[in-house]
UniProtKB/Swiss-Prot annotation:
Domain of life per record: Archaea
GO biological process, any: pyrimidine deoxyribonucleoside metabolic process
Source organism (scientific name): Thermofilum pendens (strain DSM 2475 / Hrk 5)
A Pfam family assignment: Glycos_transf_3
GO molecular function: 1,4-alpha-oligoglucan phosphorylase activity; AMP binding; pentosyltransferase activity
Active site: 256 (proton donor)
InterPro entries: AMP_phosphorylase, Glycosyl_Trfase_fam3, Glycosyl_Trfase_fam3_N_dom, Glycosyl_Trfase_fam3_N_dom_sf, Nuc_phospho_transferase, PYNP-like_C_sf, PYNP_C, Pyrmidine_PPase_CS
The protein, known as: AMP phosphorylase
Family: Belongs to the thymidine/pyrimidine-nucleoside phosphorylase family. Type 2 subfamily.
GO cellular component entries: cytosol
UniProt entry tagged with the keyword Lyase: no
Reactions listed under catalytic activity: AMP + phosphate = alpha-D-ribose 1,5-bisphosphate + adenine; CMP + phosphate = cytosine + alpha-D-ribose 1,5-bisphosphate; UMP + phosphate = alpha-D-ribose 1,5-bisphosphate + uracil
NAD is among the record's keywords: no
Length: 511
């Protein structure tokens, strides 16, 4: 059936069209059935929404279909009913608790990327994987399929180093130090990062204060060839695109069953050969104990080895924010200060520990000291400024030139004592309520660290925002909640333990 297009100002994870009920009846299409949309030799499979009072001469198409087919408003397209996607059978199989074969997994991932699965079908699949789990073979196949259904960065150099953090600790701007440290020593480290989802700033948000991060594959390859590195947003690159679609379903459900293929697929897509996996460990983070950190790391080791990837996991101290700053502009400022002045100490220590681990993975002796030397000599700072310039930013920017929110609120200590507890999740939430990361100048500056002595009236934290209303919302929260508590605590080290791979033990049943 030939219909004229009406482009609707909506976009979804899957392709969607709107048909009048009279048109749907002629096509024998019911709600959520699939239709084939054809235009100028191109086709997409879309999910049909049925409307009661829509033009019977038109088909409503979402923006992503218009982009995929090159459609303009009023163009004539061919619409016909088509069969359900092949991957539905695999989804039903997983719901029954059965393992999937590699070809079934590829079909599921392909249908996700092609927009053939509805959000309901995708949610059912994600939930099934969450409750049924995956075998190592399934995780391997999902990782491989995610890579194969997206673009890849093809750099003509080896080795390629990389880092990834499981997150959960506020203010973790270590990538802004680790990347230039590694690159300044002649190694390649193309860092693709995410924007904040549940935190006040992701690495891409922090770097965007200093330079554009929404770059193409060609631009990234050129920048890496010139500087050995980049710090860019991965969401613009179509690397493992199935992951971005799955995350949209995982987030409202509060589950994350694909975290291993998600992380490894994006590392494989940029060609990473050596990866340090940062596992922040402590109260208020995703990983609470060293035992849990070791268990999670073993799963990563097993899958990484299947791909020939050299992966080293490290559990890092995460009982408090890294450094003092939370929020894009505040953290970008602090990263520049750390590169020049080697403070705050915990940020510098963690960055040198992660960079040092990577360096030792490629044969450099005394990795930590080598990383510190790159900081002390100014090589790392110079390299970051080269990367900033290559990505289109101002290489001469100073911390003081980075604007912050002009509305502030400071919380003061009500007593003498020692800081004995800092609530990571509450601080991250305060940063978001203040407007971060959308408001780049919003965030929280923590004046104190665990174990520090404070006097009554000393500042504990300052909140920045560009909105008076948002700052007032923060003040109301701080009337009832205390993100910083006073008491006594012991000292701490940033690097808790390097976790070693352990071959799986054979299970022997007693007879």
């Amino acid at each position: 059936m030939k219909l004229k297009t009406r482009i609707l100002p909506f976009e979804s994870a899957h392709y969607t069209v709107v048909l009048d009920q009279s048109v749907a009846k002629k096509l024998d299409v019911r709600p959520s059935d699939r239709v084939l949309v054809r235009f100028n030799g191109k086709t997409v499979v879309a999910i049909a929404n049925i409307a009661k009072e829509f033009s019977h001469e038109h088909v409503g198409v979402y923006v992503n279909i218009a982009k995929a087919l090159g459609i303009s408003d009023g163009d004539e397209v061919e619409v016909e009913a088509t069969s359900p996607p092949a991957s539905l059978q695999a989804i039903r199989k997983k719901l029954q608790g059965l393992s999937l074969e590699s070809d079934e997994i590829y079909q599921v991932v392909k249908d996700i990327v092609d927009g053939k699965l509805s959000e309901l079908e995708l949610a059912a699949f994600v939930t099934a994987v969450h409750f049924q789990g995956m075998t190592p073979s399934e995780i391997y196949s999902f990782t491989l399929s995610m890579v194969e259904t997206g673009q890849r960065l093809r750099l003509k150099r080896k080795p390629i180093l990389d880092k990834h953090s499981l997150g959960g600790v506020p203010g973790d701007k270590t990538s802004l130090l680790v990347v230039p440290i590694i690159a300044s020593l002649g190694f390649t480290i193309p860092k693709t990062s995410s924007r904040a989802i549940t935190s006040a700033a992701g690495t891409a948000d922090r770097m965007e204060v200093l330079a554009p991060v929404n770059l193409s594959i060609d631009e990234i390859e050129r920048i890496v060839e010139k500087t050995n590195a980049c710090l860019v947003w991965g969401g613009a690159l179509n690397l493992a695109p199935a992951d971005d679609i799955i995350i949209r379903v995982e987030y409202p459900l509060g589950i994350d069953p694909f975290y291993i293929p998600s992380i490894l697929a994006k590392k494989l897509a940029v060609g990473s050969t050596h990866v340090v996996l940062d596992v922040p460990t402590g109260r208020g983070t995703k990983v609470k104990t060293l035992e849990e950190a070791k268990r999670i790391s073993q799963s990563f080791f097993e899958i990484a080895r299947m791909f020939g990837m050299n992966l080293q996991a490290v559990a890092t101290y995460a009982e408090e924010p890294i450094g003092h700053a939370i929020g894009p502009a505040l953290e970008a400022r602090e990263a520049l200060i750390a590169l020049r002045e080697l403070r705050p100490g915990d940020l510098v220590d963690k960055a040198a520990s992660l960079a040092g681990t990577l360096l030792e993975m490629v044969g450099v002796e005394n990795g930590y000291e080598t990383a510190m030397e790159a900081l002390r000599t100014g090589k790392a700072e110079k390299k970051l400024r080269e990367i900033i310039e290559a990505q289109g930013g101002d290489p001469d920017v100073t911390p003081e030139e980075i604007p912050l929110g002009d509305k502030t609120y400071t919380l003061y200590s009500e007593e003498d004592g020692f800081v004995y507890y800092i609530d990571n999740s509450l601080l991250a939430n305060i940063g978001k309520i203040a407007g971060a990361p959308i408001d780049k100048g919003a965030g929280v500056y923590i004046h104190v660290k665990l174990g520090e002595k404070v006097r009554k009236g000393d500042p504990l934290l300052t909140v920045y925002s560009s909105s008076s209303a948002k700052l007032q919302a923060v003040e109301r929260i701080l009337e009832d909640s205390k993100p910083v508590l006073v008491g006594r605590t012991a000292g701490r080290r940033m690097l808790l333990e390097r976790i070693q791979y352990q071959p799986p033990r054979q299970l022997v049943l007693e007879r």
